[in-house]
Amino acid sequence: MPELSHRRRMAVLAICCMSLLIVSLDNTVLNVALPDLQKEFDASVSGLQWTIDAYTLVIASLLMLSGSTADRVGRRRVFRIGLIVFTVGSALCSIAPNLGLLVVFRMVQAVGGSMLNPVAMSIITNTFTDPRERARAIGVWGGVVGLSMAAGPLIGGVLVDTVGWRSIFWLNLPIGVAALILLSLFVPESRAPHGRRPDPVGQILVIVLLAALTFGIIEAPDAGLTSPLVLGCAVLAVLAVALLVPYELRRPEPLIDPRFFRSLPFSGATVIAVCGFAALGGFLFLSTLYLQNVRHYSALHAGLWMLPMAAVTFVSAPLSGRLVGSRGTRVPLLIAGLGMTASGVLFAAFDGQTHTVTLVVAFVLFGLGFGFVNAPITNTAVSGMPRAQAGVAAAVASTSRQTGSALGVALLGAILASGITPQRYEATFTDAARPAWWVLTGCGAAVLVLGLVSSGRRAKESAVRAAARLEEAGHVPVAAKR
């Protein structure tokens, strides 16, 4: 990619952030609409989980393929296709006649979404070559997540209360069209010098692993933990892992390059992403159902309740990016872990009569923690890798996020479903949700501990060694690797 002027780099950053906005906004808006979907389609808790997880599961399964494909055939080309598919999928979601087709159309959306965020991050990485400038750009990128969290519940609440839940998908149409036009005008084409070839076997094994794991968790409350269905999913997931790891180790150009994980910071960032986004996915799912179904708030009122959390995330994400650029990843990760853990403890101790101040503090603490977690994950994932493999490295980080989000909704939703009584929904919700909040607390504690472990001197030395090996391997011609 040629060196761009400062103004052109800012334009590229803005366009990439637009893609993140529509993808992030889509999920936050939909969470507010879940109770309305539940009423219109007479949906169970597992049905609501699938409207979220069908999307995140497909994205998680295809992100690495999208990243490597973009590095090989052109990042702008793949980005354009993703915008088109996502926009069309949004239009289809808005006319879905039943829950089953809504889930299918959400999967169409996800196919497009898988081509947006990791490819956009790869474009940003190759556009901003100075480490400090890149860290600030990633901080802005993380701030867009906060913006979507702030705007999503409010916009979603207004639309659901006034027009209906279908209108939430209309939001993506003008943003998607505008991003397509600006993409053609400002973003140059770029690709890796030696893009990796497709890995269909690895791709299939990843899909089987994530699908079996998520399906088994979501369906466990209804089918039973010892049912043939759930046990079959568990066996299938274990088998997929057992086949995937040795197969990828033998591949000269694997879908998931095991050498990435020789870097302790990269491995730590991957697990932190799973834990942090599992907490976020479960948090939004449980909070929305609690506010609307137990406290009987309207969609707009529930959106206003989430505003303190979203506002703090919006403010803290750019600050996290600046801290990463000036002081490294340890401080932001410690703040993130402490905020999420403290919030989880407060939520695990609450009941339906908790004072308003307690709940607001819990929302603010979670927003603070999540706001600080995104920038160090992204910066660690892409900064220690050769620029030629930026797409794949960013895709691994993004896959970890989406996997965490899917597992968070699946696991915390399954815990809720196993303890709740439909005939006494309000009376049993708080006790049924309490174990789920403790799981969220554990996710925050994991972020805290891993933040310490993955940012020390020994961890940094492992990152240097891993990057050197990757650079050395990157200079070996593909033909010589066979």
Predicted regions located by residue number:
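Flexible cytoplasmic inter-helical loops of multi-pass small-molecule transporters
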Residues: P188-I204, R251-I256, A459-L470
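12-transmembrane solute porter fold
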Residues: R9-L25, L30-V32, V45, F215, ...
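C-terminal membrane-cytosol helix-exit motif in multi-pass small-molecule transporters
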Residues: L173-A192, I207-E219, L236-R251, V447-R457
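Alpha-helical transmembrane bundle and helix-membrane interface signal
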Residues: T129-P131, E189-H194, T214-L231
